[in-house]
Amino acid sequence: MPTPLSRRKFITQTSLTAVGLTFFSCAASKKSSAVVPGLQLGYSAITWGGNDAQAIKDIAALGFKGIQLRSNTVKDYGGNPQMLRDLLQQNRLELPMFSSGNANINTGDDAGVIASHVANAKFVKALGGKNIQLTNSSRPKTGSPTKEDLEKYGRLLTEIGKQTQALGVQSNYHNHMGQLGQTPEEVDIILGATDPAFVKLELDVAHYKQGGGDPAKAIYQYKDRLHALHLKDVRDNPAGNSGAYTFVELGQGRVDLPAVFKALRDIHYKGWGIVELDSVPSKDKTPVQCANITKDYLKSIGIMS
C-alpha cells in the first residue's frame, strides 16, 4: 500500500504530465490548423533586384520549391532560354509564376500589348513554366478609375489569356495598389469583366489588405478563380516616413496570415503560394536574411518544416 508521501508524489507527477500533454496538444493543434496539404511554396526573385542567378541559388538553399522570375530575364536569357531552364533544374526549382508585367489600356495599341505578353508566354513555355502574371499602369493620377476602364481592362486581360492559353500558358490577374484593381470593389469589377476560361486570379494578400480588403474573405469569394497567391505582409509607416506603408517579411505586418491559411485549407486549395517581398524593408538586411525571417515564421505556424 503506498504511503501518503508516495501518493502525493504520484498525484503531483500525474498533474504535471497532464499539463504538459495539454500544452503539447494545444501547440500541435495550433500548427496543424494552419497546414494546407495542397499548398506548394515558392519565393519571388524580386527581392534580389535583378540578380536572378543568385536568387535561384539562395531560394533553393532556403528550401522553397519554386521561384517567380520577372520579365527582365527575357533580356538576359531570351536568346538562350535553355540556359536559364538548366539553372532552374540544377537547383531543383519549378517556375510556378512569371511576372509578365504591364497590360496598359491607354497605349492606343492593344494589339502590341497583347503581342508582348504572348512573346513572354512563349519564353515561359521554353523555361517549362505554365503561368504569367499581369499587372497594369492604367490608374488615373487623381481620382478613381471608371467602371468602363475597369471593364476595358478585364476585356484586355481576356484577349491576352485567349492567346497565351493556346500556347499552354495560363494568364493570371494580379491585384495591386496604385493600379486598376487597388480596392476590393475594383478587383470584383475587373474579374467580372474577364472570361474565367482564360483569366485566373493571383491574389496578393498584402495589396488586397492595403487596399481595404480582407484577404481571407477574398479567398472564399474567389475560390473558383483562385489560381495562385502572393504571400506577403505589410505594415503602416510611422508618421513622417516616406510612403504610407512598407512591405515586410511574413509575420511582421498586419495581414492576418493564419486566417489566410485557414481559408486556403477550408476551400481545399491546391496550388502555389509565392512569398514576395519587393525589396528589403531596411538597408541593414539582405534578401537571404529577410527570407529566413519569413521561413522561421512559416515554420512557427506549421506551414514549413
What spans do the regions from the language model cover?
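Acidic (Asp/Glu)-rich catalytic clusters
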Residues: A34-V36, I56-A61, G78-M97, V118-G129, ...
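Acidic-and-aromatic substrate-binding clefts and catalytic sites of carbohydrate-active enzymes
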Residues: I46-A53, R70-P81, A103-V113, P140-S144, ...
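Conserved acetyl-CoA-binding loop of GNAT-fold acetyltransferases
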Residues: F64
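Short, basic, helix/turn surface patches
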Residues: L93-A103, K122-K130, G161, K200-H207, ...
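Vicinal oxygen chelate
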Residues: G101, S137, N241-Y245
